Every structure is written in structure tokens, then in C-alpha cells.
């Protein structure tokens, strides 16, 4: 017990000294790289936190290059995900050289009237730039304020979303819209708020009490979602 006490005291002393000398301690989800780069080797069967590194001698400029951000994600291709329900298509920017660099990116296309519904990235902040069209874009602050911070963005506008906060976009115009989103994690994660509550196999009475409604209403809304079975 005495040893634990001395260790804790030493830790507190080090933190105090660091603060006194203006040292900033940063805690991140993605670890710092230990080499100049670690180009992902998708053929490797090794499983690590990230992807194994390609032989540096075999690395080329193409490993740090992606062509296609200027093309609609609706064109499909590798890394494309479409949602008819919400009217958007997202395509990840596939750059093997981003492996271990704590970053990822995607192009998102939203049809007129479409939305990217309220969602959050548990492991990343986001910066989005509008490539075409106009969207209502913003985020919601944490409880208890639940303040909406949002505005209409047009081509060339940039908006930042803090890590872990619920955010959304709505193309309420008559033209298609497109955005380029960069995230501060190689694996930012994506949680759709409505799907997490209504598509997950949660007890119906729990969902009803959460939404301050009755079970019949929950069942009616759930019929519009794909209910995942555990």
C-alpha cells in the first residue's frame, strides 16, 4: 500500500511539474507512428491495431494517392456505401499510406431532400468542406444544453465537428450536394442515433420510456428500420 501511495505521489508530482513548465500532454485514440510511414498491406493475414506495413522498398507514390474525390460517390466503386432510406452515398478515400497516420476521409453525396441523419464518431473529430450544392450542417452540444450549432454551407465552406458530438446534414435545396469529410482517426467509428435506438434489439418498453411514448408507437416506427437480431 505504501508503494502504491508513493507511486501515486510521484505521478502527481510529474503532472504538476509538466503543467508548470507549459508541457502539454496529449491523449489520442490513434497511436503515434514509429516510422516515416506504414503503407497498409491488405494482403497480410496478420491482425494488428491497424494494418501491417508494406515493405518500404516496395512503396511508391501511388500508395499516397487517390483519384476520384471529384466524382460522385454514387458512381459506386470500392468503399462506397449507399442509403436509399436517407438519400446519401458515401465513399471512403482509399489511401494505403494513411495507415497509422490517425486520419481518414470520405466523399459524401446527398440528393435533394436527402439527409445524413444525426450520428457521431466516437473516436474522431471531423472537418467537412462543401464541394457542390448547399446543405444545412451542424452538431448538437452535450447534455443538458443540447444546443444546436448549425448553419447553411455552400460550395467552398468548411465546418468543424468536435469529437463524439452528434452531427447531421440536410440537403433542403433542389440540387445535389457533395462534401469532402476528413476525420482525425484511421477508424473513427460511426453510430447512427436512430438506428442505435430503433434498429438494435433493445426491449420495446425501454425504448418507449426513453422516447416518452407507448410501445405501440415504438413498434410502428421500428417497422421502418431493419431490426438487427443478436
UniProtKB/Swiss-Prot annotation:
This protein's record includes keyword Signal: yes
Keywords from the named record: Apoplast, Disulfide bond, Glycoprotein, Manganese, Metal-binding, Secreted, Signal
Example GO molecular function: manganese ion binding
SUPFAM superfamilies (UniProt xref): RmlC-like cupins (SSF51182)
Domain of life, per lineage: Eukaryota
Disulphide-bridged cysteine pairs: 38-53
Boundaries of every Cupin type-1 domain copy: 86-219
Primary location: secreted
Glycosylated residues (UniProt): 172
InterPro entries associated with the record: Cupin_1, Germin, RmlC-like_jellyroll, RmlC_Cupin_sf
Subcellular location: Secreted, Extracellular space, Apoplast
Matching Pfam families: Cupin_1 (PF00190)
Signal peptide region: 1-20
A single GO cellular-component term on record: apoplast
Binding site for Mn(2+): 119, 121, 126, 167
Subunit structure: Oligomer (believed to be a pentamer but probably hexamer).
Family assignment from sequence similarity: Belongs to the germin family.
Protein role: May play a role in plant defense. Probably has no oxalate oxidase activity even if the active site is conserved.
Protein name: Germin-like protein 5-1
Amino acid at each position: 500500500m505504501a508503494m502504491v501511495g508513493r507511486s501515486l505521489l510521484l505521478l502527481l508530482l510529474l503532472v504538476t511539474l509538466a503543467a508548470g513548465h507549459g508541457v502539454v500532454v496529449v491523449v489520442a485514440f490513434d497511436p503515434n507512428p514509429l516510422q516515416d510511414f506504414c503503407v497498409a498491406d491488405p494482403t497480410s493475414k496478420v491482425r494488428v491495431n491497424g494494418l501491417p506495413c508494406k515493405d518500404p522498398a516496395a512503396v511508391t507514390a501511388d500508395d499516397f494517392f487517390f483519384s476520384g474525390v471529384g466524382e460522385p460517390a454514387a458512381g459506386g466503386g470500392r468503399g462506397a456505401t449507399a442509403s436509399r432510406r436517407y438519400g446519401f452515398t458515401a465513399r471512403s478515400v482509399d489511401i494505403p499510406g494513411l495507415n497509422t497516420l490517425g486520419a481518414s476521409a470520405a466523399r459524401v453525396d446527398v440528393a435533394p431532400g436527402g439527409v445524413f441523419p444525426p450520428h457521431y464518431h466516437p473516436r474522431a473529430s471531423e472537418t467537412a468542406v462543401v464541394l457542390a450544392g448547399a446543405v444545412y450542417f451542424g452538431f448538437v452540444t452535450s447534455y443538458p444544453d443540447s444546443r444546436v450549432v448549425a448553419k447553411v454551407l455552400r460550395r467552398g465552406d468548411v465546418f468543424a465537428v468536435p469529437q463524439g458530438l452528434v452531427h447531421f446534414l440536410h440537403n433542403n435545396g433542389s440540387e445535389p450536394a457533395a462534401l469532402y469529410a476528413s476525420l482525425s482517426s484511421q477508424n473513427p467509428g460511426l453510430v447512427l442515433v436512430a438506428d442505435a435506438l430503433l434498429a438494435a434489439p433493445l426491449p420495446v418498453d425501454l425504448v418507449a420510456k426513453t422516447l416518452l411514448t407507448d410501445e405501440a408507437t415504438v413498434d410502428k416506427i421500428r417497422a421502418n428500420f431493419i431490426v438487427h437480431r443478436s
